[in-house]
Design a protein with these regions (language model features):
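Conserved active-site carboxylates
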Residues: 1-11, 19-35, 57-62, 66-133, ...
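Charged catalytic and DNA/RNA-contacting regions of genome-maintenance
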Residues: 143, 151, 158
Length: 211
């Protein structure tokens, strides 16, 4: 199994069925050595971080932000990057995040721009650590035509494939059109470049001080 970079947890209200304790158990049982959560807030970070540390799993801390209603995934490269994520999260809560404010806190942040948000590529080109994210083979081909910095990212919202059918009810509660959830998130597709995932993971090293 590959290292997941974009797990959405139930801290993202009505967007996921994944609870932190269940996620940690899944990672442990499947010998997955690192994992990234990337919610639309940072409320679950400490729960996730310390549970990972207690189980010898490398915690990767991300934040799913939006610019012009397009998703961008922001990851802390170190503790300073984590502090910048906290500042960005505050801007999100105040509904005042824009490109210029994002530039102010770009240091020590790695950004993954999902394929669905490629329209933002020119706007976010200021980011020194920028990757494009794909989740199909066709998207991978198109991303690689732009840059070698392209990495597999699947927005994981369930741990068991049989639970996929329940996600549509969360969509309905949020009064959104239900999506067709058919992916087997943890199947190792041949087109996944695991080495590129490891490269990204190697940049993300947050240590949160206890004092």
């Amino acid at each position: 199994m590959y290292i997941p970079l974009k797990v959405t947890t139930d801290y993202s209200l009505l967007k996921s069925l994944i609870k932190i304790p269940n996620l940690i158990n899944f990672l442990t049982c499947n010998n997955i050595s690192a994992c990234g959560i990337c919610d639309d807030n940072l409320y679950g970070v400490f729960d996730f971080y310390f549970n990972c540390k207690s189980n010898n799993i490398k915690p990767i801390i991300g934040l799913n932000a939006q610019i012009f209603a397009k998703d961008i995934y922001l990851y802390a490269m170190n503790y300073q990057g984590f502090l910048n994520l906290l500042k960005i999260n505050t801007l999100i809560e105040k509904n005042i995040l824009d490109i210029e404010k994002l530039k102010e806190y770009k240091d020590n942040i790695l950004m993954i721009l999902p394929f669905s948000s490629l329209d933002l590529l020119n706007d976010v080109s200021f980011e020194p650590k920028l990757y494009l994210g794909y989740h199909t083979e066709e998207e991978k081909i198109k991303c690689l035509e732009i840059t070698d910095n392209s990495v597999y990212v699947e927005n994981i919202k369930v741990l068991n494939p049989e639970d996929l059918k329940y996600l549509k009810y969360l969509d309905l509660i949020r009064k959104e059109e239900p999506l067709n959830y058919t992916s087997n998130y943890y199947y190792d597709y041949k087109f996944i470049d695991k080495e590129k995932i490891k490269e990204v993971v190697s940049f993300l090293n947050v240590e949160i001080p206890l004092d």
